[in-house]
Amino acid sequence: MKHLKVALSDSVQSKIKSIAGRTCVGVFETDFTDVGAVVIDDGELDLVNNNQISSFGIPIIVLRLDASRDISLYENRITSIIELLSMSIDDCTSEIEKVVANYEASILPPFFRALSDYVGDENSQFDCPGHQGGQFFYKHPTGRAFYNFFGENIFRADLCNADVKLGDLLIHEGYAYDAQAHAAKVYNADKTYFVLNGTSSANKVVLNALLTPGDIILYDRNNHKSICHGGLVMSGATPIYLETARNPFGSIGGILDHCFDESYIRQLVAEKSPEKANAKRPIRLAVIQLGTYDGTIYNARQVVDKIGHLCDYIFFDSAWVGYEQFIPMMKDCSPLLLELDPNDPGILVTQSVHKQQAGFSQTSQIHKKDSHIKGQERYVDHKRFNNSFMMHASTSPFYPLFASLDVNAKIHEGELGQTLWRECVEVAIDARKAVLKQCKYLRPLVPPIVHGKPWKEGNTHEMACDVKYFAFEPEAKWHSFNGYGEGQYFIDPCKFQLITPGINVETGEYEEFGIPANILANYLRENRIIPEKCDLNTILFLMTPAESKYKMDALVAELVRFEELIDLDVPMEEVLPSIYYGHIDKYKGYHIRQLCQEMHDFYKSRNVSLLQQRLFSREYFPDYVMNPQEANFEFQRNKGELVPLSEAEGRIALEGALPYPPGVICVQPGERWSKTACDYFLALEDGINQLPGFTPEIQGVYITEQSNGYKQAYGYVLKKEY
């Protein structure tokens, strides 16, 4: 299939009207992402120096009209010279088409290229899927609307593996293998596996490949629920939980520095599995969130140096990053750029490509970097690993998902990948500067002073290359995370997080007035701006190379407008009309500051900020009573009962309980419901009843409406009499 156009200069357009059925555009009518060649004449050589053309490696074709013109200075940048005076137009366009076709073949990665060609063959289908290239949909008005909405190619590319031309996605052969091998090269992995049902499944592939009952898993308490499901519930491993930081604003921080001390870890192992405490490598697998949802980034080299000798493998769940190796100042946090030897742990990395990279939703990838331990007993070879992969992979894959992973790797290949992310970081820096300059209530989570001057006065280009502008200085008040070590963490520059007022920066205590982030998030949604998530007094926006200055300026303008509405104390119905009219019995007559005050006072009266911090502090961890796998078995055996959370304290949880987002389990299966956990979830219950329209999503806890209209929270616990 011919995807690319040909860009022609004004002079050339007067001579060439069409090229082998391709669309022709003027050189000033394109951003060069959709053209396969630029054609100019020998009097327009200044275009050879166009940075956009050179950055994409687009062929430049020069038509010779005047043999006396000296073009020697430009020859190293010119792909082809056509002597128009001695050739027919047909021969000329044929030469141009050859160049374009070669370029087109070079930019399409292996699987996507094969898929495009296969779709172009227009085969007569008698295999799955039953819609047969969309034709079934076309036989009904509803189906036709569905087909027209998505367009022809998405249906024609939805293929069956009955035809093996595209390779096998389960045993990794043919073009499917080529695509994954190419991605491994781009990401510096030994082997890469494309996963089509999300990083929740990718994580389970990794965990089920490595862990068995009785194995020790060093468990970052920030881990996504899928780590519990795959590592604890399905594999039956024994968890050693590491406490993590939360700041008073609600941001998710990293593992405390002292948790990486060898003697401390061995002490924790001794509590659960005394016979393994003194083993050379007591830990089968450590699972670390390389980057938290809110953008606390680990130094991977530091992690491996501190605990690597205790672990067979370290698994970095990189769902919320994956682009770090394309941003030079972040390279120390990339596990895949580490130099490793036989004494180091094997490295496994999962990445949610769909989150901030260029993949369709549900696309994920697993990177395996463990050739340095090949031959050792702890090594997991491809065949054993792929056995786990096939347990979780569908035998009916959606080929466009796989193709998007292939294309993502191609986009990140070479210098262009770094260029895209550098531009993204610079856009994000400028947006933070704009908030600092234009907003009076909101502030970005960045150090106030760097290199002796205010953060906003730094040079954007230099800041994008200097991690000091994003470093978490231990115990600094501006971030209020406690327990960090020197150089341990920094802020992901691509997580644009803002802090709303209401928490005193110096003390971490609630102030008299505040603006909970949930109110700002709903205001933005009312105005068609969709943030990623919010927590108590934080709101998060994800930055990708898709962002532009125009888009960020529009966001900042809406933030400024929100602050103006707060100052004017306008009626709530003007700020949040959907919530106001959806719950008018509650909010009739409210002004926006009244809503802010009521919600702020609600959180303050229950000290939710402190409860949230305690949930992830070892001192307040729920008691570990039962292995999570056994707790789940009891749940399956119907040995649980559903009780109000007001009566759950001290009872053994049979399900993980968590708010979503962020998907981090607060009470693990097999733990006793603690007072802290009960108080936290009961505060959420109260909020659902007292502040309708701002209901959070909670999993593992069931909200049931009572006869009096009160919505009460329940959880499954082990039956007392059992």
Q: Model features per residue range: what roles?
A:
Residues K2-K5, S9-D46, N50-K165, K185, ...:
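Non-catalytic terminal extensions of PLP-dependent enzymes
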Residues G198-S201, N247-F249, T538-L540, V575-L576:
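Short amphipathic alpha-helical segments embedded in low-complexity Lys/Glu-rich regions
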Residues Y193, A286-Q289, I539-T544:
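Short glycine-rich or small-residue beta-strand-to-loop segments that form or flank ligand, phosphate
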Residues L8-D10, R22-T30, D41-G57, R64-D66, ...:
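Conserved PLP-enzyme active-site core in the AAT-like
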Residues S200, Y293-D294, S548:
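Short strand->helix junction
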Residues H3-K5, D190-T192, G214-I217:
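Short active-site oxyanion
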Residues E152-S201:
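Conserved N-terminal alpha-helix of the aminotransferase class I/II PLP-enzyme fold
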Residues T192-Y193, T350, R528-E532:
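A short linear hydrophobic-aromatic micro-motif
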